[in-house]
């Protein structure tokens, strides 16, 4: 089930397409609306379709959580797949041990830059949560592209993003933005690695990597990266 918006629909369709390519079967692909007080009808329809696991492409503090709780309460499902919008400490805390064994994914990498940003975050006293690395890197890429273009006009600096993001050039990690700007100002090249192991392909899409999450002992634990 997916939240009824562009994010949810696109994610659900992508999951179904790729899962079926691997030989899996999807029994139902149904939307749910956010902000409802009761999801028993939605859970009943999902349960009737059957399946070994329920994919909940929603939000952990909204309908997604309530669908999981209703599924557990009625015995409809006991194992869930949780995309990025459902990953957060509040969900296993709210659901408890019944969520153990569920799995999920979240953009992430075990690259050296990821640890560097994590250490910086801890030293500064803030939580390095989901999408922190990607947000940090997006801001850094824009700043470096502005420097390379000599302009803050998006029409001008967008042409420089690929140049500062990829090789050739000196590798740039979290905390080294000042160094990068000096290199660019001096006519040199940079290859921004950042916190999320940046590598842009095609028209500027991120090649991407993700963390594999397992809910265990009432907590989200990272068990691998791909």
Sequence positions of predicted segments:
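Extracytosolic ligand-binding ectodomains
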Residues: 1-226
């Amino acid at each position: 089930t997916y939240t009824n918006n562009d994010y949810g629909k696109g994610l659900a369709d992508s999951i179904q397409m790729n899962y079926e390519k691997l030989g899996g079967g999807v029994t139902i692909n149904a939307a749910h609306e956010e902000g409802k007080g009761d999801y028993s009808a939605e859970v009943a329809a999902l349960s009737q379709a059957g399946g070994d696991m329920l994919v909940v492409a929603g939000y952990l503090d909204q309908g997604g959580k309530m669908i999981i709780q209703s599924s557990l309460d009625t015995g409809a499902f006991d194992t869930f797949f949780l995309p990025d919008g459902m990953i957060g400490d509040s969900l296993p805390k709210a659901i408890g041990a019944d969520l153990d064994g569920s799995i999920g994914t979240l953009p992430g990498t075990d690259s050296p830059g990821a640890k560097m940003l994590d250490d910086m975050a801890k030293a500064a006293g803030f939580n390095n949560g989901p999408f922190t690395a990607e947000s940090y890197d997006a801001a850094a890429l824009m700043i470096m592209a502005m420097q390379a273009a000599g302009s803050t006009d998006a029409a001008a600096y967008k042409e420089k993003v690929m140049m500062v993001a990829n090789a050739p050039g000196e590798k740039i990690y979290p905390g080294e933005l000042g160094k990068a700007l000096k290199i660019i100002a001096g006519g040199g090249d940079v290859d921004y690695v950042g916190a999320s192991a940046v590598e842009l392909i095609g028209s500027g899409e991120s090649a991407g990597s993700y963390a594999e999450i397992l809910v265990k002992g009432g907590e989200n634990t990272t068990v691998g990266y791909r």
